[in-house]
Amino acid sequence: MSSDQELLTLLNNRISKTTKLIKEKQADALVIFNQANYRFLTNFSGEEAELILTANGDRVLLSDSRFKDQIRHQTPGEMKVVMQTMDVIKEIAGQLKQLDVKTVLVEGEFISATQFEALKQACPDLYFILNAELVETVRNIKDELELETLQRAIDISAQSFKEILPLIEPGVSERAIGAKLDYLFKMNGGDGPSFETIIASGYRGSWAHGVASDKKIQKGELIVIDFGSFYHGYTADITRTVALGQVEPELEKIYYIVLEAQKRGIAAAIAGNTGKDIDQAGRNYIKEQGYGEYFGHGIGHGIGLEVHELCTPAMPYSKEVMKNNMAITVEPGIYLPDRGGVRIEDDVLIKDNHPYVMSQLPKDELLIL
């Protein structure tokens, strides 16, 4: 993004879409606690803030003095900024009383029941409604800046993965490989890992979330590597499974079953299909090959400012309809207890009938190191 004016234009478009949803809820304002959501609407990346957005598009950002200069540099456009000097709920209540609002939506997932009751007691003349996933609904459809930033996060992650492969050898620990990968994210221009890097070798490959441990990698093992770097707030999420030397025939067999299942899932990732359509395209193939019981998780999820976003084909029953410029993962897997596992995951952009794989890393042949 080349200028503050271009950024402001994008932010105003996001605000307009969000205020439309506020009005559809017949509300006057939305109180936002989720860091990803207030960043989406302000460009402020600090971790301590709350945002009030009115149906008219007015914004009130509440933070503290530590972030005063950062807010000034990061947030273009008109916005009231309040440096908190008291309890956050009291501060929010005070600002709401100054606005011409009656019905207020509150992000229910990010406020405790005690805080919600305190807010209602502080503003007895206002009507509060717990609301979930309103800004997330807007975030589902990525704009130009988001796609550019997301692609950069993916490219950094992919390059870092390529650079750790020569380090994988018998006797090296999973933890050492994971630490090096996390280091490379930053050296290649990223902001560090967006989740705890998974390096799961041998029997630990059957653990869907086998984060890097002290286990030493041995010859004849599969290694599941699930990784992603942040870049300017956006995250990649990629998985590759590699082999250290030759592995037993069934482990090699399930690699190619998972690969075909993923290809079928990606092919189904088109506008108009549901999450269930994508999940079933991959899951049914794994079932046909006799491994259905060893694929226990959903086939994917949305990605963006968070590694798991609202747009999610994750569950076999998901009815969410895919739309252009949604970014999702497609990640089938087979996990054989005490023997090993395979997962292959790519980041995919919904583009009409032509899903675009954003994470360009080889996978058509099992990589043997």
Q: Each PLM stretch: what is its role?
A:
Residues M1-L369:
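Active-site neighborhoods and metal-handling regions in enzymes and metal-associated proteins
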